[in-house]
């Protein structure tokens, strides 16, 4: 489960997906199981991250700067903190959120947000301490990441004692192939903000490069999976590997044009394990392995914005392919931004329409 490491590390986690060199035709069959949906929160304004906390609340961010907790049993929303420094510009603002894996003894909260720095739009990752119902003692872990009204990445995942951060190209295509730039990367830090000694380059926070706008990140089966927005083609699901190049902007999706094939060979490019053309705008990503909805066991769940659909990607027993893909909620709630999964197996999705956004609970009928 995304950003719920105290539960995630206990699960038998697996993932891999079907590789179709021509891309998906987006004509997947309808959902293979009947799902009931109910709204547990409404009147939100662009929620961006939702995650299940150890207090049985859904912790969530809203792009304008709010961090809150939702009790899904009652619908009660409790404000945690509004960060005045946050500047919401286009798709920028208050974005990713993660909780320390040992939250009961180390109540730390990690957030990503965009702000103005001497007239420049920038992004930072800050660690807070949760105490007395609010967040205190901010510590900046990494700063001066270029931000933009689009392509900010900003998903967080804590794996063991390391913090992974996805960054977009911030509309500057020169950055992803430059390993000394922080944009267009998956970054990896220690939880105190220092650079791990076993990163690909000493003193450099990058873990992988050549990314356009990865907005989904989940750890499963000792692998880190990402969902990444393509341009007008080739949204991607990737497996993130240490020090590897994922091709952007020289490669879009698979290495299947003459120019791409040469670049891929010369630069040892990692191809996506799934790609969609036309695009569906892949965003939040999570892993499902609960008995509540047995048809979804061993699946990746992907929230999509443009397609306004929740995708279930069923993984094979060998974890090297997708056996089938199912679609849920198509157009029912509009754009879907993120997903979280409760220990009970219930699934929650948040919308990204603005003004009257909702968090929706999914359960088996």
Predicted feature descriptions by range:
Residues 1-8:
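Bacterial N-terminal signal peptides that target proteins for export
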Residues 231-246, 305:
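Short edge-strand/loop segments of extracellular domains
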Residues 320-343:
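Conserved blade-ending motifs and adjacent loop-strand segments that build the rim/top face
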Residues 206-236:
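Repeat-solenoid scaffold signature
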Residues 28-173, 219, 223-230, 278-318, ...:
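Acidic, Gly/Ser/Thr-rich repeat motifs that build Ca2+-stabilized beta-propeller blades
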Residues 78-92, 138-152, 191-208, 248-277, ...:
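Surface-exposed loop and turn segments in beta-propeller and other repeat-based domains
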Residues 9-36:
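Bacterial Sec-dependent N-terminal signal peptides
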Residues 123-132, 179-191, 239-241:
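Beta-propeller blade signature
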